[in-house]
From Swiss-Prot:
Keyword Transferase attributed: yes
Keywords carried by this UniProt record: Coenzyme M biosynthesis, Pyridoxal phosphate, Transferase
Subunit structure: Homotrimer.
Protein name per its UniProtKB record: Cysteate synthase
Highest taxon of source: Archaea
UniProt catalytic activity: O-phospho-L-serine + sulfite + H(+) = L-cysteate + phosphate
InterPro entries, alphabetized: Cysteate_synthase, TrpB-like_PALP, TrpB-like_PALP_sf
Residue list for modification N6-(pyridoxal phosphate)lysine: K104
Binding residues annotated for pyridoxal 5'-phosphate, in chain numbering: N130
Gene3D superfamilies found in the cross-reference section: 3.40.50.1100
GO molecular function terms listed in the Swiss-Prot or TrEMBL record: ATP binding; cysteate synthase activity; L-serine ammonia-lyase activity; magnesium ion binding; pyridoxal phosphate binding; serine racemase activity; threonine racemase activity
Organism: Methanosarcina barkeri (strain Fusaro / DSM 804)
Length: 416
């Protein structure tokens, strides 16, 4: 049958090796179960090293992959003796070659490969910026058609380190529409013949691609970290590393205790933080994100603004936080900018806004006593090296092929 099967977390129904986002019986997540229970590393650069726990048959030959290194200067500043940085971005001096500068590229490579292996339709996705850039890059490399819907706030983030190809189709939305509006429009486009939804957090190729951040850390450190820090918008990254950690626990060589998830959202838009403070499985919009669109506009790290995150679904972020006794933080713009300046001055690489939010949450955790000096900590910087990339590459802006005034626009108007 191949190297994995899909299993529904609620009813237990199993599916073969296919591109499937949902169970036919219920709304719970599907999870990949790999035939190899021990992690076998391939002699490949980048993400392809972790082939045995990725849902693809052909090897991924990209040099893009996560790196992990032990911090010295920043760790010393915080008084931590075992701080490791998981860096997804462009930093060739450290062996980091993600040319879209975001860990979303870890999702894009296996997703596009899985699609190619299971029918080869055009992929449709919504993006606040980073995901779209990653999928556009892989589309330009492979020639697989991709349709990307972005709110106006994300359009400037849609650049490539190579000239865009005809396989990349960008649809931007008019001012006043946000990421969730983009998700709704993309959902409609994905129903057209020959199209398939990229699936967001429901896509096991995305989750297991991002989970390689935890795999790389465990292999580098020799064990799973005690604590894991990341900024979240949908929470998919947090879910991904939790699932990867469970596989590592089954492997047996990397420890039995799951890392404690310490995740951050960016004020004023913090619906998952609000729900988790009350240990609620449900996000209540009128309580947790009152006047959401205004909050989204005021958020520094705009990519962290999903109004419909996979929080309460079985196998979603609520379950990940519960299983790891997790903590969530609400970070201000000022805290993020201060953390960014401190990190960049000490470590010598530029980081993107979500990484700044994650860094600020670590500073807060140290201040509040949520980590101790000698514990092993993994700070996942999910994007960085943009300034460094510009020293080596010419960047090309992707021009939209159409503009949508709202998510309910007639698809004929878009001329897809």
């Amino acid at each position: 049958m191949g190297n994995f099967k899909l299993k529904c977390l609620k009813c237990g129904r199993e599916y073969g090796q296919e591109y499937r986002l949902t169970c036919e019986n219920d709304n719970a997540f599907l999870r990949a179960e790999y035939s190899e229970k021990r992690l076998v590393l391939r002699n490949q650069p980048g993400i392809g090293r972790f082939h045995s726990w990725l849902p693809v048959q052909e090897e991924l030959t990209t040099d893009a992959g996560p790196i992990t290194y032990k911090s010295e200067a920043f760790a010393r500043e915080l008084g931590l003796s075992n701080l490791y940085i998981g860096f997804s971005g462009y930093w060739p001096e450290r062996g980091a070659f993600i040319k879209t500068c975001s860990f979303k590229e870890l999702e894009a490579h296996p997703t596009m490969q899985l699609l190619k292996e299971t029918g080869g339709k055009a992929v449709v996705l919504a993006s606040a910026g980073n995901t779209g850039r990653a999928f556009a890059h892989v589309s330009a490399l492979t020639g697989t058609d991709v349709y990307i819907v972005v709110p106006e706030s994300g359009a400037s983030k849609l650049w490539l380190p190579e000239e865009p190809t005809e396989s990349v189709h960008l649809i931007s939305m008019s001012p006043g529409n946000d990421y969730t509006d983009a998700i709704n429009l993309a959902g409609r486009i994905a129903k057209l013949p020959g199209m398939v939804s990229e699936g967001g957090a429901r896509n096991i190729a995305r989750r297991d691609g991002m989970g390689t951040v935890m795999l790389d850390a465990a292999v580098t450190i020799g064990k799973m970290p005690d604590h894991y820090f990341q900024a979240v918008g949908s929470g998919t990254g947090g879910i991904s590393v939790w699932e990867a950690a469970m596989r590592l626990r089954t492997d047996g060589r990397f420890g039995q205790k799951l890392p404690k998830l310490q995740l951050a959202q960016n004020l004023p838009f913090v619906p998952m933080y609000n729900a988790w403070q009350e240990k609620r499985r449900e996000i209540i919009p009128e309580l947790d994100m009152k006047d959401a669109k205004k909050q989204v506009e005021e958020t520094y790290a705009t990519v962290l603004t999903n109004r419909t995150p996979p929080y309460g679904v079985m196998g979603g972020l609520y379950d990940a936080l519960t299983d790891t006794d997790g903590i969530m933080y609400a970070i201000t713009r000022e805290e993020a900018l201060e953390a960014k300046a401190l990190f960049e001055s000490l470590e010598g690489i530029d980081i993107l806004p979500p990484s700044a939010v994650a860094t600020a949450s670590l500073l807060k955790a140290v201040e509040e006593g949520n980590v101790s000096k000698d514990e092993t900590i993994l700070l996942n910087l999910a994007g960085g090296g943009y300034k460094r990339l510009k020293e080596d590459y010419t960047l090309y802006q992707i021009e939209p092929v159409a503009t949508a005034k709202n998510p309910d626009i007639s698809l004929d108007e878009l001329k897809i």
